[in-house]
Amino acid sequence: MQNISDKKNAPLQEEVERAVEVLRRGGIILYPTDTVWGIGCDATNAEAVDRIYRLKRSENKKSMLVLCASADMVVRYVNRAPGIAFEVMEMATTPLTASLPGAAGVAPNLIPAEGTLGVRIPDHEFCRRMLRALGRPVVSTSANISGQPTAVGLQDVAQEIVDGVDFVVNPRFEGKPTRKASSIIAFGEGGEVKIIRE
């Protein structure tokens, strides 16, 4: 099913509702974030997560992060995150992914052996509304075949990816992304901090 948004003048909330409907059915979407365009699905749906791995031809499974609407949502899906992680996320002035211990409640095929979950709270209107409406985290992985260059804008996304998703969000809701991957900081249960990517 090709489901590219064809409603050029659809209001933001209508586009959010269309994306959420696809996510609730177990579909995957191509959508703008605060960094680069991403492929996403309901992070609690293991079949949808597996579809993304197959679409990206990813051999390095269990490396995708999730977007959450708020810190309140984060704590529902990680049960051993130290308080400092939330302080750092709140103070961040650029997109930051926090690798947090104690992943719980998401699809098992998202959780690596060490039990962590990469989480970002996006500063992006479309994403925030979508996450609030869905009420669950959404997978966010770069919209490219593994090993290929990151697709910064929709125009950079390979046709294979576009054809492989169930819905493509209208690019006019892109906002002002940074056009580069987020920083990544890993937090230990005891508050240890390790910068993975600046």
Region locations from a protein language model:
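Active-site-adjacent structural elements in enzyme catalytic cores
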Residues: 1-198
